[in-house]
Structures are given as C-alpha cells and as structure tokens.
Amino acid sequence: MKNLDRLFVLTGLVFLLIGMALGLKMSATMDFTLHGLHAHLNLLGFVLMTLFGLCYRAWPKMVESKLATVHYFLHTVCVAVALFLLYFLLSNPELGPKIGPVMDGFLGGAYLGILIFAYLVLTRAKE
C-alpha cells in the first residue's frame, strides 16, 4: 500500500487526539475511572502506530510485503474495537463476563498484527 508509513503515523495521531481529549476530560472532572483507557489509547494507539510508521519509513522493503497492509488493518481495527469495549468495561464493570472475552479476542488480533510486524522486521529490515 502506498504511503503506509504515513498512514500509520496519521492514524496514531487520531488515537493521540482522542487519548489526550479523554485525559483533559478526566482532569477537568477529577473522575479518573477511564485512566486505563486513556493510557491504552496513547500507548497502543499513538506510540505503537507511530513507531510502526517510522519503521516502515526506515525500511521500505517491509512495505513491499502485502503483510504490511494486513498489519495496518489488523492493528487499527482490533485496537480500536478493543478500546471501545474497554470503555464499556471500565464504565460498567458488571459487563466484564460478557465483554471481557470479546475484548480478549480483539486484543489477540492486535497481538497477531504485532507478530506480523516482528516477522517483517526480522525478514526485511536488513539494510
């Protein structure tokens, strides 16, 4: 996919804007119930997406694989859905038994995306 590195960084910025807005809301209301969501939006969303984008820029051979595009969509969709579910879980802990297993499935998908990224780094980031 063309400009995949830029797409990772731009998507990371979206996660950052949402995460920081949530942080500002928590600070303004002094209600830190969603602090775990705030942290994961910034780490899984912004930090990892930006790191992925910079790596794809540094090693363009990684982008030549169709797995790079799979990695982007897998990570983006799975993290977004998992964090959406985390919002409901933190807001309504009694939903844990119903939401938890579904969220775990999406986190497993995000982990699969990270495994794809690791494979691409190990096999294509040689120069």
Q: Predicted segment positions?
A:
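Hydrophobic alpha-helical transmembrane segments of multi-pass integral membrane proteins
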Residues: 1-127
